[in-house]
Amino acid sequence: MNLIDIILFYGFQFNDYWTTVLGLRVGAEEKNPIAGLFISSPYRLALFKFGLITIGMFILIYVVRFKTWTEIVLTVTDVVECLVTLNNTLTIRRYKRRGVRG
């Protein structure tokens, strides 16, 4: 794992966060029940999402210590986050087309 892997990981996490915030602004609902507890403020949501992923990154780097396993987990996580961001983006588009507001 190198710096580019970490930057990509956080970049995909940010895309998820930002599309979640934009989706909430157009009236979409947070489907993650745990994240739903933190959506009262974009700052609280950011602290939750980025705090949680930082803890996960720490565990991957310093506790697991298996380079191959860490690479696999990061790759799977990146793919999942891309799909989540795609879903968020399509949801935003659907809400904007309908003119639905929260």
Swiss-Prot record:
Q: Which domain of life is it from?
A: Viruses
Which InterPro entries does its entry note?
DUF5658
Q: Name one Pfam family in it.
A: DUF5658
Question: What's this protein's name?
Answer: Uncharacterized protein C-102a
What is the originating organism of this protein? Answer: Sulfolobus spindle-shape virus 1 (SSV1)
Q: What is the lineage of its organism?
A: Viruses, Viruses incertae sedis, Fuselloviridae, Alphafusellovirus
